[in-house]
């Protein structure tokens, strides 16, 4: 499987600069929040989201050099993403992310919530200073979508009436919205034609949905040391994802186990078995592959270039995480 190092080669130097700048942008006026943010930016993330912004920027600028605003947009994107992870971990009461202790487990929930708020506030400040109203609207929508996604997930816990449409809507809010809107924003900053910007949005949306579906499959199939959290943790917390939704169609018993919140001994083990036996994993793979194919199609509007090639290969990378 291709590594992110070779995948992001066209923006390698840009990403190095971004990592250095992120720590500086967060600032040290609040030592505890600064320490929390420092911990986050050192937590081994692959910087996929800012890399997409940088690749789209270079693919739409072609021979022109990246502007300071394109670089700042990539930094804002990573700040927003990181803030959402911090709040996610508080809501999910998670102790590990990428096999690294979460901010809430390292400090406490109060500091974690404030650290997330701080990053959202910082990103909003830098966003406003881009002086581009359309980009401000696109990224502000992402912050709203994060909250809406968390609310949707919370109110639908252990709800077996959840359908595929609701699942995809929640996945868009929590994952795809940031990738879609930031990709479009990069096109806007490059003064790309309107239809190109719209295709960039669609690329990001379908790539983001594929990414989330793959994540949800891995939650069932990957051991803790690979995933950085216990296998089946989504199901345990009542978050019903694509593999469980598909398996419930074949095995209604799975729905009953979920509704009683795995209260009896052996319930969870049986539920995980039913997901595997009920074609939940196979059908979810097909769903992810379909979203990936849609993402590929929307890149045809870009001229051939190394950054465009990386954006195409990124689609294969997302699906390749399953192997």
UniProtKB/Swiss-Prot annotation:
One GO term of the biological process aspect: photosynthesis
Molecular function (Gene Ontology), one example: prenyltransferase activity
CDD domains named among the record's database cross-references: Trans_IPPS_HT
Binding locations of Mg(2+) 1: 88, 92
InterPro entries for this protein: Isoprenoid_synthase_dom_sf (IPR008949), Polyprenyl_synt (IPR000092), Polyprenyl_synt_CS (IPR033749)
Cofactor: Mg(2+)
EC number: 2.5.1.-
Cofactor note: Binds 2 Mg(2+) ions per subunit.
Annotated Mg(2+) 2 binding sites: 88, 92
Membrane spanning stretches: none
Function per UniProt: Possible role in synthesis of the nonaprenyl side chain of plastoquinone or in synthesis of other prenyl chains such as undekaprenyl pyrophosphate.
Official protein name in the record: Prenyl transferase
Annotated source species: Synechocystis sp. (strain ATCC 27184 / PCC 6803 / Kazusa)
Gene label: preA
